[in-house]
Amino acid sequence: EWRERNRHFEFLPRRHSKLCIAVATNPARPGDATVGSDDPQAVNTLRRVFDTVKWLPGGRGMYDKLVELALGGEAATTRTGPSYQVLAHVRVVRFREMEYTVPAEAGPACVREILRTVREKNLPVCFPLEYRYVKADDIWLSMFEGRDGCSISVHQYGDVDYRPYFAEIEPIFWK
């Protein structure tokens, strides 16, 4: 449904929860106004909570429950303006990122396998996974030229060795 109603959308799933953070991006309509604000420190808060509970038995599952409680009632934020302002986000955290674009029809299975791998192998990661769906365009150098696609990004904090995590996840994109 989100795919049909939006120019593109993204979601950030939680690894041990059925909740996610969802973002839809569409051209503005007359009367649209900015409502709410982003929190550029949110990813730092996620890490502090993770570092506090990760050593406890069941701590990673506890982490997602705490995040669910904290974010479950978040009000929607609406941003309007030129695309260079609306699509850009303040980054106050250093991180490493690996991103692949897959055909839209392969996106859901790919993200499910990534989440399953993180859970089953108990990978120590709390940085949000990003899944972004974009409709086809006609721009020759675009990853979405001629077809709908999904960009899936995995991240790790800049001061944490990203290689073990990325090495586990990257083969999933090659299928």
Regions found by a protein language model. Name each.
Residues E1-K175:
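Noncatalytic alpha-helical scaffold of FAD-dependent oxidoreductases
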